A protein has these predicted regions:
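Mixed-charge, Lys/Arg-enriched low-complexity segments
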Residues: 1-11, 72-111
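Compositionally biased amphipathic helical and low-complexity segments enriched in hydrophobic
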Residues: 47-48, 54, 71, 92
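Intrinsically disordered, low-complexity segments enriched in small/polar residues
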Residues: 28, 32, 41, 64, ...
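Assembly/interface hotspot detector across virion components, adhesins/toxins, and nucleic-acid enzymes
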Residues: 35-39, 60, 71-73, 84
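Negatively charged, low-complexity tracts enriched in Asp/Glu with abundant Ser/Thr
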Residues: 1-52, 107-111
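Short aromatic-glycine-(Arg/Gly/Cys) micro-motifs in beta-strand/loop hairpins
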Residues: 53-79
């Protein structure tokens, strides 16, 4: 039997699942217009577009070393906003966190 090694430059099914868990609600609410995948020998990337914009705004990439990077594009160019050795780590900036609630005793003391 021949076993073919999975390329470090490609997203795994788990990586895609992590990404689409974040993307689907944003697309359903109309915040994101679409996601396009581009694959090459140098890496795999998902490009996120916003409604009424003709260019991608976010890029989630896995390079040939297996490193994940999340990029944001403003009018000045691409800026890294996250990176990690796993997709979960890299995408953590988009994970919702529970709101911080100040205990009632501290609120009263502040006044």
């Amino acid at each position: 039997m021949t076993v073919v090694a999975f390329s470090l430059a490609r997203f795994t099914p788990a990586d895609l699942s992590d990404f689409y868990e974040i993307a689907r609600p944003r697309m359903d609410r109309g915040l994101w217009a679409g996601v396009t995948r581009q694959t090459s020998a140098d890496g795999d990337q998902l490009l996120v577009t916003f409604p009424h914009l003709d260019r991608p705004v976010f890029r989630f990439k896995r390079d040939r070393r297996g490193t994940y990077t999340l990029w944001f594009h403003d009018r000045q160019g691409w800026h890294s906003i996250g990176s990690g050795s796993t997709s979960t780590e890299c995408l953590s900036i988009w994970r919702t966190r529970p709101a911080r609630v100040t205990p009632p005793a501290q609120v009263r003391e502040a006044y």
